[in-house]
């Protein structure tokens, strides 16, 4: 098996070639099952980068963000299928993909005119829309399988064609996105509309010709990776070798080859023999950006494990474990829930990683396991409201986080459509709002402040007035420029640094 690990038992197989094992019992406590994660991290910058790449000081010594675009209907009546469930830039930032709860994938392409403008603007137009997943029904377990897109990951582009992976709770699909501006015509046996010609009407031999047609973007499924997960898939990650990828559910992580759909290899399995002994679940997993044998995964107990596939076929024993000891004075009924890591992302350099729990985001050095090197509170003012957040289930929300291209800033989301941006160099942070009130082009975002006391200033909002139904769970940062995409319910906001 080599570094592939042991072969994973393929579950619920429709294909007789697939290996099968009896489905495990249902997972206990909701505390674990609802803590798989997604969170987003906010960043604050102390210098503004202009579009040409030169640094210019902002008026207050900090970078200013301005509105660029909003995508999606502006109606207050939002259907559940239109809610955005993931956002992802491709490796050069020219394409931006979103997935929603209706199983659709929408790809936006950078507007060439906005990129060529001086200063450059971050504007995107719809490039392609397709239905990635359909709702299914598991007759063996009498369970509905939602069509919701949990994750999207791009493969690096090697030719004019783009490839991406998308997944719902059970099935990962590889999609090919290509352009076509030519078609063939003048066939002897077919008409232009595709109908077969009557042989009696064929009186002359025609040479097929190539015709120019309006640009057509086609998305076609190339591979379907299914029947390998008993529990819901929470993460997919493409390896740096661009040949393999991992998929993680609550208890297992499987390794796939992009050319092989009928088998995967189980590289992590934390399922106990007795399910009553279950103490944690996997919440997120990701490959190292440059080392193809290294990956990390986080758990609901607040730990992050780094594994090396060269050490063993089954990575049940980690190479490193990152965990911050809990302060006994902060121990409470909710400690275990809020310490669950909802998202983990390795930096572009591969030296650091960030993790998001319910109240904070932490930066870890891969060379230091004992504690994070930086900790940024996201919405510490909610600590006093954990009881009510538990009752309305908000405490189980899955916030994602992301790096900027230079690993100098991080971003994540919060409630009331707020998102946070943290500058690692200046240690400054800012709270911004994705609001329809600021959808005029070039509108500069004003920093927002949350007040916890009785008196508040004019530009502050009381913590009691926060809308917990409005939340920023998914964000993405352009890999090369200061352009960010923020998903707010059914709308996608695009912001960039001030012109």
UniProtKB/Swiss-Prot annotation:
Disordered: annotated span: 1-30
List the SMART domains: WD40
InterPro entries xrefs: PP2A_PR55, PP2A_PR55_CS, WD40/YVTN_repeat-like_dom_sf, WD40_repeat_dom_sf, WD40_rpt
Q: Where is the signal peptide?
A: none
- WD repeat locations: 79-118, 144-185, 228-266, 277-317, 336-374, 391-432, 467-498
Q: Which GO terms describe its molecular function?
A: protein phosphatase regulator activity
Q: Name one GO biological process term.
A: regulation of mitotic metaphase/anaphase transition
Name of one Pfam family that matches: WD40
Could you tell me which Gene3D superfamilies the record lists for this protein? Answer: YVTN repeat-like/Quinoprotein amine dehydrogenase
**One cellular component GO annotation, for this chain's record?**
cytosol
Keyword entries, A-Z: Repeat, WD repeat
Q: Which portions of the chain have biased composition (kind: Pro residues)? A: 11-28
Q: Does the keyword Cytoplasm apply?
A: no
Q: How does it assemble?
A: PP2A exists in several trimeric forms, all of which consist of a core composed of a catalytic subunit associated with a 65 kDa regulatory subunit (PR65) (subunit A). The core complex associates with a third, variable subunit (subunit B), which confers distinct properties to the holoenzyme.
Function noted in UniProt: Could perform a substrate recognition function or could be responsible for targeting the enzyme complex to the appropriate subcellular compartment.
The family this protein is said to belong to? Belongs to the phosphatase 2A regulatory subunit B family.
**Protein name listed in UniProt:** Protein phosphatase PP2A 55 kDa regulatory subunit
Q: Which organism is it from?
A: Drosophila melanogaster
């Amino acid at each position: 098996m080599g570094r592939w690990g042991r072969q994973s038992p393929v579950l619920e197989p429709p294909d007789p070639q697939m290996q099968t094992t009896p489905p495990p019992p249902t997972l206990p406590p909701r505390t674990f099952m609802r803590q798989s994660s997604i969170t987003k991290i906010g960043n604050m910058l102390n210098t503004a980068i202009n579009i040409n790449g030169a640094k210019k000081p902002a008026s207050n010594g900090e970078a200013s963000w301005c509105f660029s675009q909003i995508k999606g209907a502006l109606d207050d009546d939002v259907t559940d299928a239109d809610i955005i469930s993931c956002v992802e830039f491709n490796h050069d930032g020219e394409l931006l993909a979103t997935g929603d709860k209706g199983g659709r994938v929408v790809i936006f392409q950078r507007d060439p005119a906005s990129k060529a403008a001086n200063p450059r603007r971050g504007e995107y137009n719809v490039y392609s829309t397709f239905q990635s997943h359909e709702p299914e029904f598991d007759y063996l377990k009498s369970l509905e399988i939602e069509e919701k897109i949990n994750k999207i990951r791009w493969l690096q582009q090697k030719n004019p064609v783009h490839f991406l992976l998308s997944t719902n709770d059970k099935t990962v699909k590889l999609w090919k996105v290509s352009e076509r501006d030519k078609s063939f015509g003048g066939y002897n046996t077919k008409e232009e509309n595709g109908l077969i010609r009557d042989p009696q009407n064929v009186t002359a031999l025609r040479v097929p010709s190539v015709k120019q047609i309006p640009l057509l973007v086609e998305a076609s499924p190339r591979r379907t990776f299914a029947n390998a997960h008993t529990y819901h898939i929470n993460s997919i990650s493409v390896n740096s070798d661009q040949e393999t990828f991992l998929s993680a559910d609550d208890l297992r992580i499987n390794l796939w080859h992009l050319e092989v759909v009928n088998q995967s290899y189980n590289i992590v399995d934390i399922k106990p023999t007795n399910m009553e002994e279950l103490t944690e679940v996997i919440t997120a997993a990701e490959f190292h950006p440059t080392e193809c044998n290294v990956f990390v995964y986080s758990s609901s107990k607040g730990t992050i494990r780094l594994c090396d596939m060269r050490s063993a076929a089954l990575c049940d024993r980690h190479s490193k474990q990152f965990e911050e000891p809990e302060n006994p004075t902060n121990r409470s009924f909710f400690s275990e829930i809020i310490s669950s890591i909802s998202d983990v992302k390795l930096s572009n350099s591969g030296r650091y990683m960030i993790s998001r729990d319910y109240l904070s985001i932490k930066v870890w050095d891969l060379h230091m396991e004992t504690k994070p090197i930086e900790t940024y509170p996201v919405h510490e003012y909610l600590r006093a409201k954990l009881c009510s957040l538990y009752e309305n289930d908000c405490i189980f929300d899955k916030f994602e986080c992301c790096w900027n291209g230079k690993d100098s800033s991080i971003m994540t989301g919060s409630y009331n459509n707020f998102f946070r941006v943290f500058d690692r160099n200046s240690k400054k942070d800012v709270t911004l709002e994705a609001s329809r009130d600021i959808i005029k082009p070039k509108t500069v975002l004003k920093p927002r402040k949350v007040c916890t006391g009785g008196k508040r200033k004019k530009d502050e909002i009381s913590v009691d007035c926060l809308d917990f139904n409005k939340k920023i769970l998914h964000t993405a940062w352009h890999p090369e420029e200061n352009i960010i995409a923020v998903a707010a319910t059914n709308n996608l906001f695009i912001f960039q640094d001030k012109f």
